[in-house]
């Protein structure tokens, strides 16, 4: 009788463990769907969705699988209003992606001058370098944006 009870307890515990594991897996899948929605909204400039996420406490500097933040994505896609919304909500403009590039560097590559102006005001460290060893000044020179950077520095 003791063995049957013990075996029943073990089987119940295993069943509960598998159930919790499946539940955890489902939660992770749902969370990843929300992350994708947040980044899609930043990518296309859907500020209503971005604002909803931010107002509900979603981590504004969360990184996607490519190591980008929503601010980086919005800047690269030219979504000025979304960039402004994210900055006003506390997004960190100085974060770097897996290549060491910042949102400002992305805006310079895409020649998004008005976005670059907003991002430049974040005053990231001038010593910040990407993985290629380029600081902002050298990066701007390589991408033909040194005049743009000078104009940002003079404002």
List each language-model region with its residue ranges:
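Conserved ankyrin/ankyrin-like repeat signature
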Residues: 48-49, 81-82, 114-115, 147-148
């Amino acid at each position: 009788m003791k063995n049957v009870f013990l075996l029943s307890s073990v089987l119940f515990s295993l069943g509960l463990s598998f159930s919790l594991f499946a539940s955890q897996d489902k939660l992770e899948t749902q969370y990843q769907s929300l992350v994708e929605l947040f980044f899609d909204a930043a990518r296309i400039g859907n500020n209503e969705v971005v604002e909803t996420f931010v107002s509900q406490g979603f981590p504004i500097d969360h990184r996607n699988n490519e190591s980008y933040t929503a601010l980086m994505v919005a800047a690269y896609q030219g979504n000025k209003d979304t960039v402004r919304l994210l900055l006003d909500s506390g997004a960190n403009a100085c974060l770097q992606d897996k290549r060491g590039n910042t949102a400002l560097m992305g805006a310079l590559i895409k020649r998004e001058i008005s976005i670059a102006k907003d991002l430049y005001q974040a005053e990231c460290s001038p010593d910040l370098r990407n993985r290629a060893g380029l600081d902002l000044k050298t990066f701007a020179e390589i991408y033909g944006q040194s005049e743009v950077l000078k104009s940002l520095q003079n404002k």
